[in-house]
């Protein structure tokens, strides 16, 4: 099955994208239910992706040479688990906000780390290799995908999905060469945003520092006048 050509596209590519059912694209693996009190940072134990980090703390494309995940504490490693591979996707299966249900991250670079997916996550893998590493994270972050999720998310105060719901969802898949160009561009944009945010944070700290200095000078001036 095919979908229409997107409105914005690299000019060297032509032809329609494949419209692919997510449940046909991904194979799903069991995850664990370890809570935060079973996790810690800074050890050599297996790392665990908690759904809270998908919502806040991790970028769409995870690079473990610079991004940090917690380790499982001693004695709490699950008996059965599936190690994540580069290119694997993890979805958060629950949220109070329908816009955050099925929020996805992709393991772009594991950096030699052993990682498993944990509480309230759905672990998916493209075993057919129809996609390149780095593309799926952005495809599953698209507005088109999340419009589909909002229609099927279940709940009242907490909205949730499961892997079976992905039989009702589709994403567009272009050629691998086009996927690479899309993923590279979006990753560069993400990196630029991170850099700019750091600059903004430093400038805000500088402004606060100058305000403190100004307040101190005014206080001293007031004391001198007294």
Specify the residue positions occupied by each region the protein language model found.
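Extended intrinsically disordered, low-complexity coil regions enriched in Ser, Thr, Gly, Ala
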Residues: 193-208
């Amino acid at each position: 099955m095919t979908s229409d050509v997107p409105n914005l596209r690299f000019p060297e590519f032509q032809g329609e994208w494949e419209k692919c059912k997510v449940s046909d694209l991904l194979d799903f693996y069991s995850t664990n239910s370890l809570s935060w009190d079973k996790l810690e940072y800074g050890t050599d134990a297996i790392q665990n992706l908690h759904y809270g980090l998908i919502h806040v703390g991790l970028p769409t494309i995870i690079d473990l040479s610079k991004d940090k995940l917690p380790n499982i504490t001693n004695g709490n490693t699950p008996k059965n688990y599936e190690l994540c591979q580069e290119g694997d996707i993890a979805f958060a299966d629950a949220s109070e906000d329908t816009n955050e249900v099925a929020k996805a991250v992709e393991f772009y670079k594991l950096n030699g780390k052993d990682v498993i997916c944990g509480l309230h996550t759905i672990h998916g893998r493209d075993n057919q290799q129809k996609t390149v590493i780095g593309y799926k994270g952005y495809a599953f972050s698209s507005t088109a995908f999340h419009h589909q999720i909002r229609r099927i998310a279940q709940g009242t105060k907490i909205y949730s999905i499961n892997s079976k719901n992905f039989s009702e969802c589709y994403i567009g898949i272009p050629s691998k060469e086009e996927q690479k160009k899309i993923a590279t561009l979006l990753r560069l944009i993400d990196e630029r945003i991170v850099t700019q945010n750091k600059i903004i944070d430093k400038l805000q700290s500088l402004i606060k520092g100058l305000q403190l200095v100004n307040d101190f000078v005014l206080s001293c001036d007031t004391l001198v006048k007294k």
